[in-house]
Amino acid sequence: MRRRDFARATSGAMFIAAALCTTAMADDVKRVSANGTELAYVEAGQGEPVIFVHGGLQDHRMWAAHLPKFAERYRAIAYSRRNHFPNDASPDGLPDGAADTHGEDLAAFVRALGLSKVRIVAHSSGAHAALFFATRHPDMLVSLALNEPPATGLLAGQPGVADTLKEWGSKQVPAREAAKAGDTQRAIPLFVDVVGGPGAYERRSDADKKMNSDNVASFQADATTKLPRPVFTCEMAKA
């Protein structure tokens, strides 16, 4: 598959990724030690490696519908990020938004698989992590396809951005407060409806809802962390 074809296939995949119905994968879940933790992954196909990075409240199952098609020409690999199912997970663990650490985990994951250069396809908070990976490890990257990275630092100084981000943050308060209180059954629908619009959670399949529930620990960690959220800047993008 040439670069243009890869970009076209990836673009189509990214636009429907968030609405996937997760399905069981034929490949067994494998595990590898990377950056001091154990990461679960699935893979299919042979050839040039493409690594798929999921977003928040998700895991490697997000990509289940896509891997078979990519596996026709690539070694398609989808892994679960630290503190996401089926890895060890805890509300006291790594927040979903810790993009810098997740980016280093990705680099360690690539090395643990014995790979040198990879293509990356990433969604949401996983895409934010992929930006840190790309900046810090450009020698490991062949191409980067991102969908909805919350890289708000790239908009710094633009007119109206501060007010927009403030409004966005205020919309997330109910979900985060519910997560802090341990009311995950309320927190998940609230957050999904903020991101996807009113009724987005109810429109999700039972499989997707289960995946969201399985990955609530990292969302709770995000809501309770005292650590500053990593910021990806224009200066970093230019480096």
Language-model segments: which ranges?
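Alpha/beta-hydrolase fold catalytic core
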Residues: 1-50, 73-74
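Short gly/ser/thr-rich secondary-structure transition/capping motifs
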Residues: 31-35, 58, 222-230
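Conserved HGGG/HGGXW glycine-rich cap/lid loop of the alpha/beta-hydrolase fold
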Residues: 34-92, 109
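Active-site loop/oxyanion-hole signature of alpha/beta-hydrolase fold enzymes
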Residues: 77-121, 125
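Conserved hydrolase catalytic core segment
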Residues: 116-155
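Helix-rich cap/lid subdomain of alpha/beta-hydrolase
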Residues: 153-208, 223-226
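Conserved serine/cysteine hydrolase catalytic core
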Residues: 207-239
